[in-house]
Design a protein with these regions (language model features):
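A well-structured
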Residues: 2-289, 299
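Auxiliary, metal-adjacent structural segments of Zn-dependent hydrolase domains
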Residues: 282-329
Length: 329
């Protein structure tokens, strides 16, 4: 069997617990103060910086994952909010200073000749262009607000056969051949979602206002153009996206309509109902290769074992670490 060894850190303490900004500040200070007097020193500096970034990103990711899985858990909510409001804002100016230190180092131009580093350097320069001190507070606010949609949608469930089920699980009933069942479940789902319309509208209005302010602070006319640059869309333009949209409308939409008409004919219907989109048009029962999350995982591990034991080893390790949340999906 394949054994996956945990990555051993060389810069950040393996036992580090991020419970305050001060817990990571010493590593940031070491990076800021280190003398980059050779290309080898610069490479090591980048490696150490990358390791610290990975540690921080993983810590925040787990806070977000736990909060998303258990939306009613106030401790998980507080842990995520603490990171994005107390730690992230203090990281932002130091991250900008580290980017400036990197670009100011004369050896970075030698690294730029290597493709992998060229891509990274391009991203760093873009981050420097986007950084505005006045946006730190806005970004913290946005990080906190954007998770609210997940909290709202994650709390949604319906009653079916005397049982409270998640929206993901309810969606499976839309594949059943019994139209009365599909219609009933769909209407319950729609009613539940409708009850959150006012809250979601308010949230969306707030996000639009703050995102527009963020973009204008950075010198952009709108948030779309700002986000395009922030996400590193270097190899194509927004005009390329518009052209793609036009192509989809011209070539794909007619195909989808044709497929829908063929589905209608097979179902002996004249118009689509919203609960008809997932059901098998030929009257076949939905496939049920597994009943539980454990069955799904065990089956996947068995298949991956035949393909490559390394793949199944990854899944086994993730299972041991309790990194799966399959039942609710």
């Amino acid at each position: 069997a394949y054994i996956m060894n945990k990555y051993r850190r060389s810069f950040v303490d393996d036992q580090l617990v991020i419970d305050s900004f001060e817990s990571v500040e010493k590593y940031l200070t070491l990076l800021l103060e280190r003398n980059l007097d050779s290309i080898e020193a610069l490479r090591q500096w980048l490696k150490d910086k990358s390791e610290l970034e990975a540690v921080l990103e993983e810590d925040m990711a787990w806070r977000y994952i736990r909060m998303s899985i258990d939306t009613a858990n106030e401790e998980y909510q507080k842990a995520y909010t603490f990171f994005v409001t107390e730690i992230q804002p203090k990281l932002a100016p130091i991250d900008d200073a580290l980017n400036k230190k990197f670009i100011a180092c004369p050896f970075h131009t030698a690294l730029e000749k290597e493709e992998a580093f060229a891509i990274h350097i391009r991203s760093v320069k873009s981050q420097l262009e986007l950084y505005r001190e006045e946006n730190i507070e806005i970004q913290a606010f946005l990080s906190e607000k954007t998770q609210e949609f997940g909290t709202i949608s994650g709390a949604q469930s319906i009653e079916h056969d005397g049982e409270s089920i998640t929206m993901q699980k309810a969606g499976l009933y839309l594949k059943e051949q019994d139209e009365r069942l599909r219609k009933s479940v769909f209407e319950k789902m729609a009613a539940r979602r409708s009850s959150d319309i006012a809250d979601i509208d308010t949230l969306f209005d707030t996000l639009i206002q703050k995102r527009t302010e963020l973009a204008k602070n950075a010198g952009f006319d709108n948030y779309r153009d700002y986000k395009f640059k922030e996400m590193g869309r270097f190899d194509y333009t927004k005009e390329s996206c518009f052209e793609f949209h036009d192509s989809v409308e011209k070539h794909i939409v007619p195909l989808v309509k044709k497929i829908q008409q063929e589905r209608l004919a097979k179902m002996n219907k004249e118009i689509f109902r919203p609960w008809d989109t997932a059901v098998n048009a030929e009257g076949k029962a939905p496939l049920k290769p597994f009943e539980t999350g454990k069955e799904m995982l065990d089956g996947t591990i068995a298949v991956f074992e035949k393909i490559n034991p390394e793949f199944s080893g990854f899944l086994k390790t993730m299972e041991e670490m309790k990194h799966f949340d399959l039942e609710s999906k």
